[in-house]
Swiss-Prot record:
Name of the protein this chain belongs to: Mitochondrial inner membrane magnesium transporter LPE10
Function according to Swiss-Prot or TrEMBL: Mitochondrial inner membrane magnesium transporter required for mitochondrial magnesium homeostasis. Modulates the conductance of the MRS2 channel. Involved in the splicing of mRNA group II introns in mitochondria by affecting mitochondrial magnesium concentrations, which are critical for group II intron splicing.
Swiss-Prot/TrEMBL keywords: Ion transport, Magnesium, Membrane, Mitochondrion, Mitochondrion inner membrane, Transit peptide, Transmembrane, Transmembrane helix, Transport
Transit peptide feature, positions: 1-37
GO biological process: mitochondrial magnesium ion transmembrane transport
Length: 397
């Protein structure tokens, strides 16, 4: 993106300099290259600053909020260098890829357990959990959001772990309390989003029961796409928890406080973190089931609408066929009337009942053609699957 911006700025500077050279003296024209390079550098710096303000990251820094072991905010909105973060906390450079590129909500979650830390990327929440520190990475657009402020307040209360009248002390270690706060915030956001999506979809489906319009179908299509994206996001988070619950060594390595104090856990000694993950896995599974039911209702409604539209289309086709049958039936009496009305001598005109006979023959031919065609049309309408298989068998013979 910087290369594109640099090319645009150079083109703008060249145009400005080309226009200005039309009124320059020869001495002044000699200094245009220096002015052009200076203007290009200034514009490039301004564009870099503008991009940093828009996307919330610098060339080598990451903005974050740091909590200490007591749950207090040490430094809000602190810019930490990427190299310093990797070297100080024992991370790999690729571990920060999702955090650096998280300009929007990430669909794919990640849960990385390292030697002395846990790196979590869950929807809009991206944190690094250590046995005595929590680093919350502030993504673009989340600094002033209500959900981000609520998450920071909830995380602060759980990390402080004060013994109050309404809230007792939590026996879980520091890192598990941080994880629980992350899951609670993520689940509350997912639940709120699910309630909004479900309410909108139910309202559209109820409106479609009374009238089917183009605007409602278009709105239902857009809402179905949003619901599908939300369903994918919840399924990915649930699958991530499934993978974690199946890896006993990873669960044991999540006891950061015990590992710091020299206490190692065996493969089957991870009941606390397993119960914690299973609890939120069940909540996520409930959200997934509700979303699946709504998606199935939307698909069922779409199928019913398609059936209704096909039925209406068939009715229009039948109406056109009936008009065609009527026009075909009118051909019989018209033909007889044209013969009777020819300016030729015939015995019909000499009789007293010629006109009545011609009219009767025309009406009889009209009725015969009409009822014969309608009878065959009804046979085609009442054709069942059994009749179709017998017809296909007869054709093969």
């Amino acid at each position: 993106m910087l290369l594109v911006n640099r090319a645009i700025t150079l083109n703008l500077v060249k145009r400005c300099c080309w226009r200005s050279t039309m009124f320059m003296t020869p001495k002044r024209f000699l200094g245009t290259s220096e002015e052009e390079s200076t203007a290009a550098l200034l514009l490039q710096k301004n564009l870099i600053q503008r991009n940093n303000m828009l996307y919330g990251h610098g060339s080598g820094t990451i903005r974050c909020t740091v909590f200490d072991a007591g749950g207090n905010i040490v430094s809000p909105a602190l810019d930490i260098k990427r190299e310093e973060l990797v070297a100080k906390h024992g991370l790999l450079p690729r571990d920060l890829r999702k955090i650096e590129k998280s300009r929007k909500n990430d669909l794919v979650p990640s849960f990385l357990v390292r030697k002395n830390g846990i790196l979590v990327s869950l929807a809009t929440i991206k944190t690094l959990i250590k046995p005595d520190m929590v680093i919350v990475f502030d993504s673009f657009g989340s600094l002033n959001s209500t959900s981000h402020k609520a998450f920071l307040n909830s995380l602060k209360l759980r990390l402080q772990n004060l013994d109050m009248v309404e809230l007792k002390k939590d026996p879980l270690p520091y890192e598990f309390r941080a994880l629980e706060s992350i899951f609670i915030s993520a689940l509350s956001n997912l639940t709120s989003e699910m309630n909004v999506q479900v309410t909108i979809c139910k309202g559209i489906l109820q409106d479609l029961e009374y009238s089917i319009t183009r605007d409602k179908l278009k709105f239902l299509l857009g809402q179905n796409k949003k619901l599908s994206n939300f369903y994918k996001k919840t399924v990915l988070i649930r699958d991530m928890l499934d993978d974690l619950l199946e890896q006993s060594d990873v669960l044991c390595s999540m006891y950061l406080s015990d590992l710091k104090n020299g206490v190692e856990h065996k493969d089957d000694d991870h009941s606390e973190i397993e119960m914690l993950l299973e609890t939120y896995h069940n909540h996520l599974d409930e959200i997934v089931q509700i979303t699946e039911n709504i998606i199935s209702n939307v698909k069922t409604t779409e199928e019913i609408i398609n059936i209704i539209l096909d039925s209406n289309r068939n009715q229009l086709m039948l109406l056109g066929i009936r008009f065609s049958i009527g026009m075909l039936s009118l051909g019989g009496p018209i033909f007889i009337g044209s013969l009777y009305g020819m300016n030729l001598e015939n015995f019909i005109e000499e009789t007293d009942y010629g006109f009545i006979a011609a009219s009767a023959i025309g009406m009889i031919s009209l009725g015969a053609l009409y009822f014969y065609s309608i009878k065959h049309l009804h046979k085609l309408q009442k054709m069942s699957l059994f009749n179709y298989t017998n017809y296909a068998r007869d054709v093969k013979k």
